[in-house]
């Protein structure tokens, strides 16, 4: 067994993305909202090994997610406790406090968040005791909120201490350039990135603005809600985890992600693209061949973060196909991409394409605007272009910190001001790392 524990949900964003993900997982595996199998099924879809990665089967035949929900204020988790999927989760896996982090990293990390830490770790330990061979952890949280950034990074630190060698993958909601929910997002993002840089093995960033635009352009939703965004994010998370949950010709496990995508420990922020993203009205007019969806992944309009990969260089690329896909078509599509001059690979990593194929086609939730398609692809690519995202947030951090704006709220919660400069220097070093990695190595060789 290769189980994965989802720490779905640290904070509001994490909880709501978690809801969308578990609704989708349940549909994909044929599990009803009450945790029992759909009529006509004798066992969940995905085979014995597959579904047990994410679900634990009880003696009564109920399937319980290996997941923990965490938030410092009760509202969002109360929605889970009273919602359609309330019977799916173990009540003790829904952990909420009484006061929120007020968009303040220091409250989530040092004061309010720390009070809940023992309860959360205790619950995670109980879930891990039920696992035969724990593979790792999957986090969903936002970088800009107080709970997501503060408590999220505190949990990652603790899990590194308690479960040293286990993989820790994050899906992190990055503050969008235009769609901002709080003024202090740049502070929270820089502080949490600094704290988690050495603890997370691989971080898939998701940018709300990029997903807003996908919903508007591809799904024809004039005013996308957070539910629309979360349904789309859930499809991506499902694609990344599909090869852990279903059989395929080329399966990828958690450790393989970092082995294939992370050339240096600090440079662990792959860019995620997904195709096809089609509304129900357009679905029948598209052929969605393997070649078309593969090419679409290299278009900026299908990326989860606003940046331009055409100006960056690719260090490593992972293509995860789902559904009606044969290896020969994939090889042809990849060869065509490599022949194009638009995709630049770094010169020290010439081949750089890892491929996974899972035969289970993508599923669309009933209330989603996404259409059901026979095949889809999710591309994870480690590209130097994602450094743009760090530059943007660092610049906003500098503008505020030059005036020491809002700093007193953080210091008042027991944080030292020196942490701001330390975190900012670490991110400046991260920007430099990306520049160095993208530089051609021929110049270095001439020195010898």
Curated annotation (Swiss-Prot):
Subunit organization? Dimer of alpha and beta chains. A typical microtubule is a hollow water-filled tube with an outer diameter of 25 nm and an inner diameter of 15 nM. Alpha-beta heterodimers associate head-to-tail to form protofilaments running lengthwise along the microtubule wall with the beta-tubulin subunit facing the microtubule plus end conferring a structural polarity. Microtubules usually have 13 protofilaments but different protofilament numbers can be found in some organisms and specialized cells.
Name the gene.
Answer: TUB1
Record key words, sorted: Cytoplasm, Cytoskeleton, GTP-binding, Hydrolase, Magnesium, Metal-binding, Microtubule, Nucleotide-binding
In the UniProt entry, which residues are flagged as the active site? Answer: 256
| CDD domains from the UniProt entry | alpha_tubulin
This chain's function reads: Tubulin is the major constituent of microtubules, a cylinder consisting of laterally associated linear protofilaments composed of alpha- and beta-tubulin heterodimers. Microtubules grow by the addition of GTP-tubulin dimers to the microtubule end, where a stabilizing cap forms. Below the cap, tubulin dimers are in GDP-bound state, owing to GTPase activity of alpha-tubulin.
Q: Which reaction does it catalyse?
A: GTP + H2O = GDP + phosphate + H(+)
Q: Which PROSITE patterns match?
A: TUBULIN
**PANTHER family found in the cross-reference section:** TUBULIN
The entry's protein name is: Tubulin alpha chain
Where this protein primarily resides, as one coarse class?
cytoplasm
């Amino acid at each position: 067994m290769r189980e994965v524990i989802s720490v779905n949900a640290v904070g509001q964003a994490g909880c709501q993305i978690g809801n969308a993900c578990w609704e989708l997982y349940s549909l994909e595996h044929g599990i009803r909202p009450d945790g029992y199998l759909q009529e006509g099924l004798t066992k969940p879809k995905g085979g014995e090994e597959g579904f047990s990665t994410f679900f634990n089967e009880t003696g009564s035949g109920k399937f319980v997610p290996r997941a923990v929900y965490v938030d410092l204020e009760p509202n969002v988790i109360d929605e889970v406790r009273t919602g359609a999927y309330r019977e799916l989760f173990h009540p003790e896996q829904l952990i909420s406090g009484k006061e929120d982090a007020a968009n303040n990293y220091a409250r989530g990390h040092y004061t309010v968040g720390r009070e809940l830490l023992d309860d959360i770790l205790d619950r995670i330990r109980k879930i891990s005791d039920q696992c035969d061979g724990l593979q790792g952890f999957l986090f969903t949280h936002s970088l800009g909120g107080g709970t997501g950034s503060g408590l999220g990074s505190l949990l990652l630190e603790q899990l590194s201490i308690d479960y040293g060698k286990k993989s820790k993958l994050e899906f992190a909601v990055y503050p969008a350039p235009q769609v901002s929910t709080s003024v202090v997002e740049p502070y929270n993002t820089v502080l949490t990135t600094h704290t988690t840089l050495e603890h997370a093995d691989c971080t898939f960033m998701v940018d709300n603005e990029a997903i807003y635009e996908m919903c508007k352009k591809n799904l024809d939703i004039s005013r996308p809600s957070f539910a629309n965004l979360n349904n789309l994010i859930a499809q991506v998370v499902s694609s990344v985890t599909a090869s852990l949950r279903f059989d395929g010709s080329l399966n990828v496990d958690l450790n393989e992600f970092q082995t294939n995508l992370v050339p240096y420990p600090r440079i662990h922020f792959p860019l995620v693209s997904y195709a096809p993203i089609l509304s129900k009205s357009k679905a029948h007019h598209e052929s969605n061949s393997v070649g078309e969806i593969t090419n679409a992944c290299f278009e900026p309009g299908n990326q989860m973060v606003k940046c331009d990969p055409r100006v960056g260089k690719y260090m490593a690329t992972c293509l995860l196909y789902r559904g009606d896909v044969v290896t020969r078509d994939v090889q042809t599509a990849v060869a065509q991409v490599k022949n194009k001059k638009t995709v630049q690979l770094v010169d020290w990593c010439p081949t750089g394409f890892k491929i996974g194929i899972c035969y289970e086609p993508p599923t669309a939730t009933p209330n989603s605007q996404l259409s059901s398609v026979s095949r889809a692809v999710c591309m994870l690519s480690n590209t130097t272009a994602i450094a743009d995202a760090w530059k943007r947030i660092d610049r906003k951090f500098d503008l505020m910190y030059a005036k020491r704006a809002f700093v007193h709220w953080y210091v008042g919660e027991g944080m030292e001001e020196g942490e701001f400069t330390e975190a900012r220097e670490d991110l400046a070093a991260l920007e430099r790392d990306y520049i160095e990695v993208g530089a051609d190595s021929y110049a270095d060789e001439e020195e010898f």
